[in-house]
Amino acid sequence: MNIVTKLLAGVALLAAANSAFAGETLDRVMENKAMVVATNSSWPPQSFLDDNNEMVGFDIDVSREIAKRVGVEVSFQTPDWATLTGGRWQGRYDLGVGSVTPTKARAQVIDFAGIYYYSPYVYVVHKDSTAKSVEDLNGKVIGVETATTSEDFINRKLEIDAPGLPPVEYKLTPGEVRTFADSMLPFDDLRLGDGVRLNAVIAPEQTAMNAIKNGYPLRILDGGYAFREPLVVIDEKVDPEWTAKVGGIIEEMKKDGTLASLTAKWYGKDYSAD
């Protein structure tokens, strides 16, 4: 086989390999007339099980609307966070709608279909705490959910991969950081009292407000957000056509006010604006 023939054979093999992935997820979704969404079952009000053991929440409504516009049915799976954000789904899920932050590390293993809302992170203290500012929390015990942007933030390693965001300011030097496997577990410790186990929690404003609404004796510290993060719909890094299709639907949902309505429904205010 001469050099030209070898080169042509190599190009053909590369093209064949690429075509094997072209449209892979989109073709599967359209053939099955259904898509499987990876999300969380214990993160109210984003996604959780109601009294009838049905999945409900903001992320669930967003998923259903995307499926409706694709023209297919939707079902939900609830892998752990590392699986959801780690890619290599091997076709088990078609989409991830779990309030995922686009970081530089995640961009290596998953595709970002589009930003569908923004989440301001806040400092939360017990209602009896004497803390009045972020500076009052220096040297204190801070709780965060593990493997999240709140953990990256408290460790001063936050790298959000999105244009137009202001630089992150680090104003807090904790005495100790305690991590938790679930978003509500830090609040469960904080509700026991100021300093009993924690002095503060860094969490999304929406999650904190939901905890307070449900009777947790907490308050959000005045003085502004810790940081503001974009949240993206994600998919496996195998099908640019599917990524683009879902991204187009997200843009439509922004323009026609659907995302504004859904954030207002679940959070009481519009978190969809850029």
Where are these regions (language model features)?
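Extracytoplasmic small-molecule ligand-binding "clamshell" domains
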Residues: 23-99, 245-246, 253-256, 265
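Extended ligand-binding regions for polar small-molecule ligands
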Residues: 24, 61-69, 128-131, 135-149, ...
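Ligand-binding clefts/hinges and TM-proximal coupling segments of bilobed small-molecule sensing domains
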Residues: 24, 149-172, 177, 216, ...
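Bilobed "Venus flytrap"/periplasmic-binding protein-like clamshell domains
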Residues: 36-44, 55-68, 101, 122-181, ...
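Periplasmic-binding protein-like
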Residues: 41, 117-125, 171-172, 205, ...
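Acidic, polar ligand-binding/catalytic clefts
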Residues: 64, 68, 73-136, 219, ...
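Short helix-initiation/N-cap motifs at beta->coil->alpha
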Residues: 76-86, 168-192
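A ligand-binding cleft/hinge motif common to bilobed small-molecule-binding domains
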Residues: 83, 100-108, 152-161, 188-227
